[in-house]
Structures are given as structure tokens and as C-alpha cells.
Regions:
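Intrinsically disordered, low-complexity peptide-like regions
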Residues: 8, 15, 283-284, 296-297, ...
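Short, flexible, solvent-exposed loop/turn segments with mixed acidic/basic and small polar residues
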Residues: 15-17, 190-195, 691
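Ser/Thr/Gly/Pro-rich low-complexity, disordered linker/stalk segments of secreted
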Residues: 680-681
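Bacterial Sec-dependent N-terminal signal peptides
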Residues: 1-24
Length: 759
């Protein structure tokens, strides 16, 4: 059993307190009663909202923890009357904002909160997170006294020595980015050699549908080639399609696979029939009652600690059939392989909201718009008024002053201190359609919603059906119910998020809520999501600039940000929000935020058979992956312009695919041939010869008892098939119509042989 010992003392008594773990790992940080912080959420209903500081720390598994607070300066203010916090409002159009709450529990002549330090331990496979809250303000309602810790030093000691070894993957990197003590972590980069398939970085689960599974394998190939070890499994292989069984399976995968997945994709629509879709948790605990039940919660499938937080990223492509799977996978691949070069697409992100004086809709989007404007973009604002007047005040909601102080003129200066800078309030759905048609890399809508609509400016699935935008957008739909992927049952009646993905145009990924959510909690989550995509957005949370802008990982990051905001209050609403907000799309989709540039790459065109390494020169920070026959053999990162990758000895005739990726850069793909034998005769292995290579027009295959030949593109799709070939001594295949590029040829004889060739 892990234990935590908490000591609180005044500076004058410091010498009388000897730390329990004096010679082991410890970490100290300073605390001030800072009113200008990103702890935006109010306290729980019926209690005063007070200043506090919440921080994440990485700690060794099974370590005992000691938390010390050395109070350097404190004060007491008399005759302070603090109002009780009202209950959080649901995002219903008929909602009246905050409602008063019972305050009787405060009047017992004790300080609230009762403890100066509150903590929660979050368990993971390699390490734990310790979430610590220091109450810099405490209140005695009977005496009307406000007790303030003006300065303090907090020290966390453990009984462990040395650094924590953590598997290097995108999810762990995301978690460590939010801790105050990242230096305790040593990321372990494990070698990736042929023949190791004990685990995967990325798990794709499909229904028992062969056609959908084939498209999952196409996505697997695309991700594997860029260095993300990917595995596809059907529900038949998992043996269950109930949410409890899926969760138990994913938990076993998380704790036992090597490598363990950082993300899982459910490539299928919601359905309890394993041939038609993939199930999810159907929750019956909505605070507003049965009218909003059941609601779907994919997040619970990966919430292994049952605390509302994901232990890995979960994403869903809601494909109800093979056609939809094809469309969604192809959207992803086309977007990354051929990103748009139009500068206007990146220069004009779009925010849209309906002003409601009692809510934060307008703050949620304007803060994002202000950030974009301060970073050399010209945000396209599409706004309307639900409840006014929209002439001065940002909002009458509690804690609005904290939000404005932090993001306003006295803080980050993303927004002015009032809303008078906005004057256009008559936008409508046509304006939203035009923004999408013209191209915008990012669109957020913030208002009330229904299954098929955004409230104001009004926009519906009918508007989506009419879109012909060739440049796809990433869409954040924080509006209620717009991500209810159990709604309807056919293409004519699906939720707004699904419709964005199911048309040929629209969006390549969407974040949306599966039911009615709560104001302020969902706004805070949204700012957390945005901080992952643009890490300087909230400077006092997280300190990493991630290699890629993965919106699926941003969805998870936003939930960890929400958890610590005004921790430990409103925890049930935070869990509800985390369960409601879903990411629809490929888990490793990277969104482009600037006009892409080419990666400068130099590598040998050939290697000798038996080679075990290759040196590649490339722009620093580029991720490099080598694969043979769609199986990763090595990966690394260019540092100071170069990287040497090591692998098992390569065989004569093999073709190594080289893929480089980097945020806001074009994906680079090229080949390295493993030479040996007579180049004039081509690639030779056993009794099979393929020549010439590269080929201009006619490819020749020589061998005995060849029964079938398939030529596939680098997505694994069959382009040419030549059957019943065993009577010919040399088989000739016309390749003149093939676009120039890399291809694979699968030759079926007594065994199956796979070759690569270049056109």
C-alpha cells in the first residue's frame, strides 16, 4: 500500500522537523497567493470560491511520499463576506445560469477547506502522477475571516532513489509535459527490430467485417511506415463486444504489451452487434436525468483508474460500412500526404459563438481568436446573439473576473477587458458554410446544440450535406449532443460530427459531445485542448512543444488540464465532461497550422546486403522511419541534422522505404535498394527474378510455377493482378500506365515472394 505523509509547519519550527526521506529524491517549489492564475473553475456549490494552487508531479511507482509545506508568510483579513458558489448550469437553451446552493455546511466555526494540502495519486504503468492542491486561501464563514498563505515552500520527498524509466511514446510524453518535475523522468527509447510484434504503439480495433478490416490495414501500413508500430485486431480476435470486456482487454494490453499502445482507434460505428460496429459504455448517471440517458462514453473504455481520466488516447472513426471506412481513412491519408499549400487556409482560422451574458461562450472562442490574432493570423469571427446585451460585459457568470484577468489586458492580452470591440452579431449558417468552402484549418463553434444542429449561428447537417470544400477542416463542436454517435440509424439521421466525416468533403476530424454538458467545465476543457495544439497558449501549464499537433492527444490533454483546474472541486462534473467529449478521426492524425515546407533529406540510394545501419541527413527534429514490406525495421530522430539508424542485417533484393515526417512539413517518402547479384538481371531470390528495376514500361518476372501476381501501391491496395501465369517462362506486365513511385509486387508460387520496384 502506498502511503503519503503530510507535514505543515511554520518557518520558525522548520529545524524541529526532519524529513522522513532525507537522502532520497525530493522536489521543492514556491507557492504564492496569486489571484491571476489559470484556475478558472468555481468551487463546489455551496462553498466559497477561494484561491489555490494545483500541480502535477511524477513520482516512482510504489514509492512512499512525504509532502512538506513551509509557510513563510501568512495573514488574516477580518470582516470578509464571501458569497457561496452557485451550482453549475447545464448547457440547455432554457437554462437560467447558476442557481443558489445550500451553505449551511460552512457555518461550523472551522476553516474551509478543512485541509491546507489535498492530493490524489493517479496510477500508470511506468510511474504515477501526484496531483497536489495547496489552499492558499481558507475561510471561516462564522468569523468572516480569510486566512491567506502569501508565500510558502512545498517539498515533496520520496523513499526512491534515481530517475524513473518511462517508455517513450506520445501519451507518456504528453503526461510528463504537465508535471513540475520532468527531470525525474528518463525516457527509454527501445530498439525496433524486425520480428518483434509483442505489442504496438497504436491498436486499431474493427468490427468483424473483412472490408472494414482491409481499410484498417491500409491505415496500419500508412502509420507503420512513418514509425508508429500499428496492429489491427477484430472483435472476433478480442472475443467480446461488451464495454466491460473491451475495457478489461484494453487494460491487459496496457499493462502487458511491449511496446504498450499510446492510442487505440475504434474503426466502426456504435453497435452491439460485432459484425456491424463496436460497442461503448451507455451511461445512466446524467445529473439532468433520464431525458439525457443513456449517453455514450468511449472514455470509460480506457479509464483504468475509474477517475474520469484516460490511461491511453482513444479515438473513433464512426464508419458504419466499408464505404465509410474507405472515405474516412482516405481523407486522413490524403490530408497528410498532400497537405494544402494555400496560405489563406492557414491564415484564417474560424471561431463561431452565440453571445449569452450568463455563460462563457463568448469568452471561450474570443480568447482563442485573440491568441490567433496575436500570432500573425487573422481570425474569421462568425457570431450571433442568443441573450444580450453584447455591449460591454463579457459575462455575469461567477469567476468571469478571473478569466478576464488571466487572458485580458492585465494578463496575456488575448482579449480586451470588455467586449465592445465586437460589432458584427448577425452572422448565420451561410457564413459558416462560406468559411468552410473557402478553407480554414481550424473551426470551433460554441453555443447550445442538438444532435443535428448548432444553435446560433444556426448550422445543421443539411448545411454540411451541401459543402463542396476541397480543403478539409478540423472542427471543435463543444455544443451539446452534436457527437451523439448512437443517434439516428442511417445517413439521413446521424449526428453533426458523424456527418462532417461521412461526406466527401467537410472535415477530417471532429471533437464533439455525446450529450448535454455543463457550462464553464466544458469551456475550461476546451482551453486545455487548445493548449496542447498551441503550447504557449496557457504558459503556466505544461512546458513542452510536442513533435506533432495530434488533436486526439489534445482531447486527452484537455481532460488532464480540466482535472487540475480548481482541484478537487466539481469532480463529478469533470468526469461527466471527460466522458462526453469524444474525438472522431484517426488517433495519429496531425493537423497542419502553417503552409507546409519540404524536409531536406539526403541518404544513400543503395546499401550492401548484410548492412546493419544507415546514416540519414535531414532537418533537425525530423522523425525518420525505415520499413521493409510495410513492417518497421528502425526509427529515430534527426538531431543536429543527422541520424544513424540501426537494424537487423538486410537481405539482397530488399527495398527499404524511408519516411520522414515533421510538423508543418510535407511527408517525405523514398527508397533504398539493397544491392547484390547481377543488377542487369534485377532482384533475384531463390527461383524468382524481377527485372528491370526501376521499370520504364514492361516489368518482367521469371520463375517456375508462378500462379498469381499482384502489384500493390504503398497503401497495400492492389493496382494490377495477373492470374493463371504458370505456363509462361517469363511473364511480362505492362506498367506504363502506373504513376511514377514505389510499388510492391506479390508473387505466388510454391511460396509467396514480395518485392519492391520503382516506376
Amino acid at each position: 500500500m502506498n502511503s503519503i505523509r503530510i507535514l505543515i509547519f511554520n518557518i520558525f519550527l522548520f529545524l524541529c522537523n526532519i524529513p522522513l526521506f532525507a537522502q532520497h529524491y525530493s522536489f521543492s517549489f514556491e507557492v504564492e497567493n496569486n489571484t491571476n492564475s489559470s484556475a478558472f473553475l468555481p468551487s463546489s456549490a455551496g462553498t466559497p470560491t477561494l484561491n489555490s494552487v494545483s500541480k502535477y508531479f511524477a513520482v516512482p511507482k510504489d514509492a512512499e511520499i512525504e509532502i512538506l509545506i513551509d509557510i513563510n508568510k501568512e495573514s488574516v483579513l477580518d470582516n470578509i463576506a464571501l458569497p457561496a458558489t452557485a451550482s453549475l448550469p447545464a448547457d440547455m437553451p432554457s437554462g437560467n445560469g447558476n442557481t443558489p446552493s445550500d451553505t449551511s455546511s460552512l457555518y461550523s466555526n472551522v476553516l474551509f477547506p478543512h485541509k491546507t494540502i489535498i492530493h490524489e495519486r493517479l496510477e500508470f504503468a511506468d510511474f504515477d502522477l501526484l496531483l497536489v492542491n495547496i489552499a492558499t486561501e481558507r475561510y471561516n464563514a462564522d468569523k468572516k475571516e480569510l486566512h491567506i498563505i502569501e508565500k510558502a515552500t512545498v517539498t515533496i520527498n520520496t523513499d526512491a532513489k534515481g530517475k524513473i524509466t518511462v517508455e517513450e511514446n506520445a501519451f507518456n510524453e504528453m503526461l510528463i509535459s504537465v508535471v513540475e518535475n520532468p527531470d525525474i523522468v528518463c525516457f527509454e527509447s527501445r530498439p525496433h527490430t524486425a520480428g518483434r510484434r509483442d505489442g504496438a504503439n497504436y491498436l486499431i480495433i474493427t468490427p468483424d467485417n473483412d472490408e472494414i478490416t482491409r481499410w484498417a490495414d491500409t491505415l496500419r501500413t500508412f502509420r507503420e511506415q512513418q514509425g508508429i508500430i500499428t496492429k489491427v485486431m477484430t472483435l472476433k480476435e478480442i472475443r467480446h463486444n461488451t464495454p466491460d470486456s473491451l475495457k478489461a482487454f484494453l487494460r491487459r494490453v496496457y499493462y502487458n504489451w511491449d511496446p504498450r499502445p499510446a492510442a487505440v482507434l475504434l474503426l466502426g460505428d456504435f453497435n452491439n452487434d460485432p459484425t456491424l460496429g463496436i460497442s461503448s459504455f451507455q451511461m445512466l448517471d446524467h445529473p439532468q436525468g433520464s431525458q439525457f440517458e443513456p449517453y455514450l462514453a468511449d472514455n470509460k473504455l480506457v479509464d483504468f483508474n475509474n477517475n474520469g481520466l484516460p490511461s491511453m488516447v482513444i479515438a473513433r472513426m464512426p464508419a458504419a460500412n466499408a464505404h465509410e471506412a474507405h472515405l474516412m481513412v482516405q481523407k486522413t491519408i490524403d490530408y497528410e500526404r498532400h497537405p494544402y499549400s494555400n496560405p489563406d487556409y492557414y491564415a484564417h482560422p474560424t471561431t463561431s459563438m452565440a453571445f449569452q451574458l450568463s455563460r462563457w461562450f463568448q469568452l471561450c472562442t474570443e480568447i482563442i481568436a485573440g491568441y490567433f490574432d496575436s500570432h500573425d493570423k487573422k481570425c474569421n469571427r462568425i457570431n450571433a446573439i442568443y441573450e444580450g446585451p453584447a455591449d460591454s460585459l463579457w459575462s455575469t457568470a461567477q469567476n468571469t473576473n478571473k478569466v478576464v484577468d488571466y487572458f485580458g489586458e492585465n494578463g496575456l492580452n488575448y482579449i480586451p477587458d470588455d467586449i465592445s470591440h465586437l460589432s458584427q452579431w448577425d452572422n448565420d449558417g451561410d457564413d459558416l458554410s462560406n468559411a468552410l468552402e473557402n478553407g480554414t484549418f481550424f473551426l470551433i463553434h460554441r453555443d447550445h446544440g442538438t444532435f443535428e444542429t448548432w444553435g446560433m449561428p444556426f448550422f445543421s447537417t443539411d448545411n454540411i450535406n451541401k459543402l463542396h470544400n476541397e480543403m478539409l477542416s478540423f472542427v471543435m463542436s463543444v455544443d451539446c449532443q452534436t457527437g451523439a454517435f448512437d443517434y439516428g440509424g442511417d445517413i439521413q439521421h446521424d449526428c453533426l460530427a458523424e456527418r462532417f466525416l461521412r461526406i466527401n468533403n467537410g472535415a477530417m476530424a471532429v471533437i464533439a459531445a455525446s450529450q448535454l454538458s455543463y457550462s464553464f467545465v466544458n469551456d475550461t476543457y476546451t482551453w486545455g485542448v487548445f493548449d496542447y495544439l498551441f503550447p504557449d497558449f496557457i504558459p503556466d501549464f505544461g512546458d513542452s512543444h510536442f513533435d506533432f499537433k495530434y488533436p486526439a492527444f489534445a482531447n486527452a490533454y484537455g481532460k488532464y488540464y480540466l482535472k487540475q483546474s480548481s482541484f478537487p472541486y466539481n469532480d463529478s462534473y469533470k468526469t461527466l465532461t471527460n466522458n462526453l467529449l469524444h474525438y472522431f478521426g484517426d488517433a495519429y492524425l496531425q493537423i497542419f497550422s502553417e503552409v507546409p515546407q519540404n524536409i531536406s533529406v539526403t541518404h544513400p540510394e543503395e546499401l550492401d546486403a548484410g548492412s546493419r545501419s544507415v546514416t540519414i541527413f535531414a532537418d533537425s527534429g525530423s522523425s525518420i522511419a525505415l520499413s521493409i514490406d510495410n513492417e518497421l525495421i528502425a526509427k529515430g530522430k534527426s538531431r543536429n541534422g543527422t541520424a544513424t539508424l540501426h537494424f537487423n542485417p538486410v537481405k539482397e533484393g530488399a527495398v527499404i522505404k524511408v519516411v520522414l515526417t515533421k510538423q508543418n512539413h510535407y511527408r517525405h517518402e523514398s527508397l533504398i535498394r539493397v544491392k547484390g547479384g547481377d543488377d542487369n538481371e534485377g532482384d533475384s531470390h531463390d527461383t524468382i527474378s524481377v527485372f528491370p528495376n526501376p521499370v520504364e514500361d514492361v516489368l518482367k518476372i521469371k520463375g517456375r510455377v508462378i500462379s498469381n501476381i499482384k502489384i500493390c501501391n504503398n497503401l497495400g491496395q492492389t493496382i494490377i493482378e495477373h492470374g493463371n501465369a504458370d505456363s509462361a517462362e517469363v511473364i511480362e506486365i505492362d506498367c506504363s500506365s502506373l504513376p511514377h513511385g514505389a510499388y510492391y509486387i506479390i508473387i505466388s508460387s510454391e511460396t509467396q515472394t514480395v518485392r519492391g520496384f520503382v516506376r
